[in-house]
Amino acid sequence: MSSASDLLIVGADGNPLDGPPPVPPALAVLPLRETVPFPDLVIPLAVGQERSLKLLDDVLSADRRFVMVAGRDPGVEAPGPEQLYEIGVIGTIARLMKVPDGSTRLLVQGGQRVRITRWTQREPYLVATIEELPDVVQESDELTALVREVQRTFLEIVESVPYLPEELRLAVANIEDASQLSHLIASALRITPAEKQQLLEQPDVELRLRRLVQLLARELDVISIGTRIQDQVQSELDKG
């Protein structure tokens, strides 16, 4: 998983751009199951449904952009507008590979956070009008302290659990942008999709970091309890 600082933003012609292109008034919408997208990150996706493959074919011939939106119920395979969250992320196809089983695997570069304002098409795939939801950030000593606390706690978690790759440690330690840091950690942390969505929907970076502090503290508590249980079990086995 990469931060925005590691990525090269390209246009429809494949040439580098100076920054994210302006948000268009409408885009195709790709529903996601069990995945909450975040800005600044590269997101691996596997697509197999006919309507999703049609969407990809069409956006590839345009500017390669679409909106990624998480479904409210991961058990629904083909959610309609009523079963999707209103806030998602613009994605740009960075790499695409078709596999023998007929599905497509792709890497999508997360862009701006957007809100769906109106659904304009349901077939052959979803299309909606959108508006950008930019971050609200005010530099302060409080924000700096929150960034340091989030980094410190997350790095402690990385050293304690196997599900977080070691390269995350270096990435988190070197990110200076508070918003990018929050997106990376929110995506990597083992929390529920609903909790990830709440973090995505929070435009105030300071409030987002405060919520992350709470979630990170909870994860540390869970890790501590798990370690204590393992120690107790091992002690009983040694006695036996």
Language model features: what each stretch is:
Residues M1-G240:
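N-terminal low-complexity, acidic/polar interaction/targeting segments
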